[in-house]
Amino acid sequence: MTLPLSIHGVVCKKDGSTVKINVGENDGDPVFCISDILPHLAQKQMKETASDFIPGESLDLILGSSIPSKKDEELKDKPAAKKAILKILKDSYGIEEDDFGSAELEVVPAGKARDLGFDRSLILGYGQDDRSCAYTSARALIESSKDTKRTNCCLCVDKEEIGSVGATGVGSHFFENALAEVVARLPAGYSELSLRRCLANCNMLSSDVNAAYDPMNPDLFDRDNASFLAGGIVFNKYTGSRGKSGASDANPEFIARLRNLLDNAEVKYQMAELGKVDQGGGGTIAYLAAKYGMNVLDAGVPVLSMHAPWEITAREDIVQAFNAYKAFLTLE
């Protein structure tokens, strides 16, 4: 647990101003961490199951240990270290303690992505699930041709790991409402039927990573149906747990069109499952988009050590994902 961490986010103050926070990424910045129990005193902890090994309440950050000046009378009723930290925050950012009630902060591993391996063919970085797919998708749209016959968009959503809930998850009506605004500006005007037809006629790639084959844990994978690092972008016909539970299952006609498109564009791709059927599974946002009747296929970068503090991808797969997303935007 004791890894260098950085803090990113915003603090919204009562006066309407917003303070951006980014501490731990630049040279010279301090970093933060979470303390570990020393093995000599961990007899009780070692008996816990993996899910109970570290309680959520034990994930507080170490922020400092300074002793404040005796002149700080307004902080005299607070613990010594807390006084010093609050003074630094006030002097550096103009933030009061109460302002954290209207803050949105993320704690992530500190440090930039790095080349991995002697040949520098791999990338080690945090949050590549799903930054590797979000970035390549956005870049593909930015660099796409403006002469396509279809309207293209890149929708970046969050909260996927907890069920795609909330206003910024794909479970919200944001995409549907945005499309309704487009339909309302067409010459024929808005109608509920026109909107539903438009949604049903969409083609979508659900940009999400897949588990790369791990040679150190081969028993978790069916090698014949696994994705491999440097094998290209991964297509998952279906996701889900222990088969297709909770899955979105792409139709073969749509997949065939994509295969033809990528073959003509000389894009490397592979078909895969997440792992052995009876080992577990996983889901994406594809099923939430498929409810509109549109064509949806999961397509993303294979990742090793998914959900670890530092995840591994291959440079080749990042390139092929970008090429695949860019080619997809030309689909008629």
Each language-model region and where it sits:
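N-terminal hydrophobic/helix-forming segments and targeting peptides
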Residues: 1-332
